[in-house]
């Protein structure tokens, strides 16, 4: 995203709204997705791109139940039509044209029926997180969350009752165009209580259907707390700061605002598995040719 395009778009928005403000980069990172069976739309949700660093491939990250069309716990079909999706439409920002979107349609299954998506190598289908596709055209604006740089993960301290935001599309609603809605709630536990076998934590947030697959971030302006070795320090800053925490996957039940978030460490594992799968297929393709 060029600074010139961003600056001109900001001037346009401020002129139209009469409000002097800015468009947060995190608003640009959440992507509206729609799941289809052939031409029939079944559902909508949220996704985002993730990459290890600025030099690595980026993959689309969303919930497994979004692409399977099935309840993670019961395996029941989620659509009232009794169908499961076989393709997904992703609304990307157009490259070089902020405020315009480009739809990319991807199949979910190979010709042999094997899913295109990659699951967690440790937990498999138990983890409600998948990665899809590593190659994107030059016509889409790629704005990933980075797993292994301080751009999106800088050891900010986030404790119980601290605010966190779920940035997605509740009921398919957007704030404008295909820009997402920020739903903000609170951490409902300590992050250090997660494990490799159960890398899920709870938040207390009024998130709803359509926000499944949303990035969950601790966004701070004016100041933040940071883990520095074995200490927690307070930092005052005029610039906004955030910590990417994981991916939202829905409420624990319909009567509660407690929601599950799969920790960023799961996304790291899946990204590495997706990269390995991509390289293996590239090598096999070269050998066959």
Task: State what each model feature region is.
Residues 1-20:
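N-terminal targeting leaders that route proteins to membranes or the secretory/organellar pathways
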Residues 5-10, 53, 107, 117-123, ...:
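Cysteine-nucleophile amide-bond enzymes
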Residues 7-11, 23-26, 218-289:
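C-terminal subregion of chymotrypsin/trypsin-like serine protease catalytic domains
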Residues 28-31, 43-44, 76-198, 204-205, ...:
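Serine endopeptidase catalytic core focused on the charge-relay Asp
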Residues 40-59, 258:
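A conserved glycine-rich beta-strand in the N-terminal activation segment of trypsin-fold
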Residues 43-45, 60, 183, 244-245:
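Structural detector for hydrophobic anchor residues on beta-strands
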Residues 50-52, 190, 219, 250:
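Residue-level recognition of beta-strand microenvironments
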Residues 63-66, 168, 246-252:
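Short beta->alpha transition motifs characteristic of CBS
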């Amino acid at each position: 995203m060029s600074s010139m395009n961003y600056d001109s778009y900001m001037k346009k928005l401020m002129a139209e709204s009469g409000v002097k403000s800015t468009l947060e980069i995190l608003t640009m990172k959440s992507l509206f997705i729609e799941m289809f069976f052939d031409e029939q739309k079944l559902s909508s949700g949220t996704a985002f791109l993730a990459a290890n660093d600025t030099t690595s491939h980026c993959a689309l990250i969303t919930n497994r139940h979004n692409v399977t069309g099935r309840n993670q716990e019961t395996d029941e079909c989620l659509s009232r039509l009794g169908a499961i999706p076989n393709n997904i439409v992703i609304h990307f920002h157009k490259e070089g044209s902020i405020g315009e979107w480009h739809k990319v349609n991807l199949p979910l299954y190979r010709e042999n029926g094997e899913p295109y998506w990659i699951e967690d190598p440790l937990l498999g289908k138990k983890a409600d997180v998948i990665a899809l596709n590593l190659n994107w055209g030059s016509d889409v604006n790629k704005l990933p969350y980075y797993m292994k740089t301080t751009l999106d993960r800088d050891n900010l301290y986030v404790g119980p009752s601290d605010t966190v935001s779920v940035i997605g599309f509740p009921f398919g609603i957007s704030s404008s165009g295909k820009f997402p809605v920020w739903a903000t709630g609170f951490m409902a536990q300590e992050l250090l209580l997660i494990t490799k076998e159960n890398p899920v934590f709870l938040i207390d947030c009024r998130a709803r259907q359509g926000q499944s697959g949303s990035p969950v971030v601790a966004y701070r302006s004016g100041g933040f707390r940071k883990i520095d070795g074995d200490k927690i320090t307070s930092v005052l800053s005029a610039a906004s700061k955030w910590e990417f925490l994981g991916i939202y996957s829905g409420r624990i039940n319909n009567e509660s605002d407690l929601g599950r978030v799969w920790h960023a460490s799961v996304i790291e594992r899946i990204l590495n598995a997706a990269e390995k799968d991509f390289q293996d297929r590239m090598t096999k393709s070269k050998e066959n040719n």
